[in-house]
Design a protein with these regions (language model features):
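S-adenosylmethionine/decaboxylated-SAM
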Residues: 2-191
Length: 191
């Protein structure tokens, strides 16, 4: 299946890391668990779903976690889909071609964390609340959910600290020298 994450259906382009998601899909064993915190309109989720389909990894459980209500910090409240109360519908519409490759959890990241036991996740990708407090909270809630050898990663990490400074501060304080900046404005930590 061809990728469609660059199609106009997504309206805005936040997925700057398709290669990272492709790498995750290649590395994960069939039957593994991936959790994406913050899925917005599904652009990055579409990359993962297409990769899982193309690699015939039908047993990977890929969870997308979002309230689909937007957040103040990113200016999402002005988005037309949020104003109409239809962002979740837009997300599902955008991913209709790969609907069997993801499991949506319409809840907060904290609520979702209670659905996963420690060591049960292979990969958790944090891209939800971009405030310092929000990122710290998500790291605290999810870092122990990662199995040994698994990956905790996230988006909007600028090593120079020029943009999304609160994300960088929270990640650096949590992991220090263990943080690996990766292409596409992402960060990663191996457990």
């Amino acid at each position: 299946m061809d990728h469609f994450f660059q199609s106009e259906r997504f309206e805005d382009s936040y997925c700057t890391y398709p290669n990272l998601y492709q790498q995750f899909a290649q590395q994960i064993q069939d039957g593994g668990t991936i959790v994406e915190l913050g899925s917005w309109k599904g652009q990055s989720a579409s990359v993962m779903c297409v990769e899982l389909f193309n690699q015939q990894k039908n047993k990977v459980r890929f969870f997308t976690v979002d309230t689909w209500e937007g957040s103040e910090g990113e200016g999402h409240k002005e988005d037309k889909w949020i104003k109409e109360g239809k962002l979740y519908d837009k997300f599902k519409e955008n991913l209709q071609d790969v609907e069997n490759y993801y499991i949506p959890l319409k809840m907060t990241t904290e609520q979702a964390s209670h659905h996963f036991s420690d060591g049960s996740c292979d990969i958790v990708f944090i891209d939800a609340d971009h405030t310092y407090e929000g990122v710290k909270k998500d790291i605290k809630l999810w870092k122990n959910k990662i199995r040994k050898g698994g990956t905790l990663a996230g988006h909007d990490y600028d090593p120079a600290g020029k943009s999304w400074a609160e994300v960088k501060k929270a990640v650096d304080e949590s992991f220090g020298n263990d943080v690996m900046p990766v292409i596409g404005g992402c960060w990663m930590v191996q457990r």
